[in-house]
């Protein structure tokens, strides 16, 4: 019985940590990415018409956390390289992946 209670508490703390990561990710995304991307759900278009919305990114077929890590750490045309800590990057990725329609 103690083992089950421990597992329930462990799972609950993991869910809480994920929610906090996403909240932090939303803050970082707004500050760092919001100039070009529509960061929040409900924003129909990005300020930069060539930049996808975060909802579009999250729902791109095959999109994974690993793919977003590559995108955020590899220079590519049209997107500046931001200096983010690993934790900041992971929080932004958690936020984007949390926007997936079929979680």
Regions found by a protein language model. Give the residues of each.
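Sec-dependent N-terminal signal peptides
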Residues: 4-13
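Electrostatic cytochrome c docking/interface patches
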Residues: 14-28
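Short sequence/structural segments immediately N-terminal
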Residues: 28, 102-103
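The canonical Cys-X-X-Cys-His
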Residues: 32-40, 92
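Short, non-ligating residues that shape and space the ligands of small metal-coordination modules
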Residues: 42-43, 63
